[in-house]
Amino acid sequence: SLVGSEMCIRDRSTGNYPGKARNIDELRQDIEKVNSLLAGTFRLNLHEIYGEFGGKQIDRNEVTVDQFTGWMQWAKEQNMKLDFNSTSFSHPKSGSLSLSNPDPAIREFWIEHTKRCRRIADAMGKFQNDPCIMNIWVHDGSKDITVEKGRYREILKNSLDEILAEELPNMKSCLEAKLFGIGLEAYTVGSHDFYAGYCAKNNVMYTLDTGHYEPTENVSDAVSALLL
């Protein structure tokens, strides 16, 4: 959550529209407006980068629930439950690999970040008296074809094993795959095949993000297969 860090090539989003939210208060006003126009009850999923850092340089391996107590209180006032996401992209240590990085220092940085995010999710779940769903998606991959597909996936598996070993009663972990990230089109470490196998073996929820499917994919194929 380094303030002002540039968005890396792994994640692209729009946001330069006139009247865009300039701070968290305005973002909450936008959410309240949207919520007022929709029927039903919704949950709000926050990425770690949306914490309230008060202008302090709190790095992602230092984040705590203190940066999200404002969100928790606001969500309670809105009768809205919170879910959570770790954030591996748009950081000087993001590069092309995070949890699957062969460099122990970088890998441990992201392992610690993800562990802290799970603890934040647990605190959210306890506060709202309803489990917080904590999603883990990492951008890890390669622009060029690699001959070490198995190696990177083994590293990712070991990182996830360490992260998920901590039992937290007020949150539920889930893992998200993606066909590829922009700038990493040749190889994705956390592919659908990898996560389907990992989640089935370890009894972990599998996230199907219907907004992130590519022209070569159809989410109904994944849903119909995973429901068996």
Question: Model-found features: residue ranges?
Answer:
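Catalytic domains of carbohydrate-active enzymes, especially glycoside hydrolases
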Residues: S1, N16-I49
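Short, well-structured secondary-structure segments
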Residues: A39-K56, K81-N85
